[in-house]
């Protein structure tokens, strides 16, 4: 059973809090509800995107630095 984490805003997807920092999550990581998965930058504001369920990251659907639209699937989480 999988759930999708979708972008709530239009912006630029980032996997880490800073350029040389480790990514928030990788495929296979266990995550908890409310845990930060990525950042979507919109109008110079960094918006943390959190998991809406406990589970395991099964897929990262976009690449670092990619522009995402509202509703773009960012992650798939296996429950």
Residue ranges, per PLM feature:
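Structured functional modules or segments
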Residues: 1-79
């Amino acid at each position: 059973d999988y759930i999708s984490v979708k972008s709530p805003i239009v912006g630029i997807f980032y996997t880490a809090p800073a350029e040389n920092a480790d990514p928030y999550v990788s495929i296979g990581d266990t995550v908890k509800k409310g845990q930060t998965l990525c950042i979507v930058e919109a109008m110079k504001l960094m918006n943390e995107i959190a998991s809406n369920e406990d589970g395991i990251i099964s897929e990262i659907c976009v690449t670092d630095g990619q522009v995402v639209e509202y509703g773009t699937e960012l992650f798939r989480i296996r429950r």
